[in-house]
């Protein structure tokens, strides 16, 4: 009987948490459940991951080259696909948990999406074995 009560309590807490997150999401168009991409994304195939990394590196290098020559070319940064970056970060985290990447590999991402501004900051440090 006690085990049944504990099980019902855990289920009830999960339902209440899900309902609260749903209500919050309905009030705010920009709300995302914490770890949204971790929970909802599949592992990326190697070819897709390499393509995303290559595009991201090319775009950021173009921007930094322009910035070093006195040009602020924000059109280059606008071409960065935030979804691809989120999927890459999720994939790196998933691999790191499984032990698939070097333990010294680090990554960090932070972003905000609001009606008046969008921001995405990320860093990935990869080390050879």
Curated annotation (Swiss-Prot):
Protein keywords: Host-virus interaction, Membrane, Signal, Viral attachment to host cell, Viral attachment to host entry receptor, Viral envelope protein, Virion, Virus entry into host cell
Top-rank taxon: Viruses
Membrane listed as a keyword: yes
Protein name as annotated: Protein UL131A
Subcellular location: Virion membrane
Primary location group: virion
Its job: Plays a role in viral entry into host cells. Forms a pentameric complex at the surface of the viral envelope together with gH, gL, UL130 and UL131. This complex is required for entry in epithelial, endothelial and myeloid host cells. Mechanistically, engages host receptor(s) including neurophilin 2/NRP2 to mediate infection. Contributes to the formation of the complex between UL128, UL130 and gH-gL.
GO annotation, biological process: entry receptor-mediated virion attachment to host cell; symbiont entry into host cell
Signal peptide: 1-18
GO cellular component, one term: membrane
Subunit text: Forms the envelope pentamer complex (PC) composed of gH, gL, UL128, UL130, and UL131A. The pentamer interacts with host NRP2. The interaction with gH is important for the formation of UL128, UL130, gH-gL complex.
């Amino acid at each position: 009987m006690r085990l049944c009560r504990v099980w019902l309590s855990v289920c009830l807490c999960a339902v209440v948490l899900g309902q609260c997150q749903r209500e919050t999401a309905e009030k705010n168009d920009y709300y995302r459940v914490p770890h949204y991409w971790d929970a909802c994304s599949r592992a990326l195939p190697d070819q897709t991951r390499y393509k995303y990394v290559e595009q991201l590196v090319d775009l950021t290098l173009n921007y930094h080259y322009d910035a070093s020559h006195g040009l602020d070319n924000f059109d280059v940064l606008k071409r960065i696909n935030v979804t691809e970056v989120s999927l890459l970060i999720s994939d790196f985290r998933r691999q790191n948990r499984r032990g698939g990447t070097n333990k010294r590999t680090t990554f960090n991402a932070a972003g905000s999406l609001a009606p008046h501004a969008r921001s995405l900051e990320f860093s990935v440090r990869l080390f050879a074995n």
